[in-house]
Amino acid sequence: MRIGKVKESILKRSVLRQLHNHSEEGSPASGEDAGVLFMPEFSEDAGVALSVNPIEGWTFAAKRAVYGAVNSMLAAGAKIRAISLSLLMPQDTEEKQLKFLMKEIDALCTQEDILVISGHTAVSPFVSTLILSVTAMGIQKKKEEARAEYTDLDLVIAGTIGREGAAMIATEHANRLEERYAPSYIETAKHLFDDGSMSAVSDILQEREVISIHDVREGGIFAALWEMAAAKNVGLSVDLKNIPIRQHTIEVCEYFNLNPYMLRSGGTLLLACANGARLVEQFQKAGIESAVIGQTTSGNDRLIHYDEEARFLEPPKMDEYYKV
């Protein structure tokens, strides 16, 4: 199988179809950022939201872990309360690396008001780099009945695409970028992911106009668009030029011949909403770059427009980060 997320067809055929114990309390699904377990014996109007985010490698591991947990809960309409960590490290790991990682995680959890309530820490001969699995837990208020139709909604991006991957590449391959760019420019690129949490705009995400939210991560915005369309059974019409992206991300991608629209984009949310222009205005007032990039449509056509040309969006492929 290819590197990265398994194909949607494999996920449905070999994972979801093998899980038969479903109930009204909770069921697995593809294209969702978290699962929700409702327990009427404890609460009639709220459930426990759970998400799992795997982190590979040491680069920005703490930020990717905590920000990923926060944003996946926000996308699920939940308030994050705690995380659980599972760390597998290679045999050449030094204790100071582990201590530094946990100090970073603790500082970010304090910033986001999150508890670390359980975990597992081990050295394994079966891994060659850090594997950090983060289980996020939050409270989701019971929603109104799901909409029957998700067509004719505005598609909005909050945050810029590709900055997680660009920051990681700039950090890991700074010496190669120095062949073309000034050290100060590369240093700025390394910090593209510093503001990766969307918790500051959680109130905006609760607006009634917001119908669906998806956390843009592995596979980039193209993968997120496909996953949202597949989950809601809609088509898409997207204007590529409207997708917000920082110049540093473009430069990093051009140097390594990468497609920024298929590059991991932690710290960015994709929203389907009834009034995109109003939502964009609110995000921009909060200091978040945002834009209406298209609409959901009836049927299954998922179209990407650039100037006068249009092409079909393809199913998610391997994240561009792995090509470097």
Model-derived segments and their meaning:
Residues 1-324:
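Helix-biased detector of long, well-ordered alpha-helical tracts
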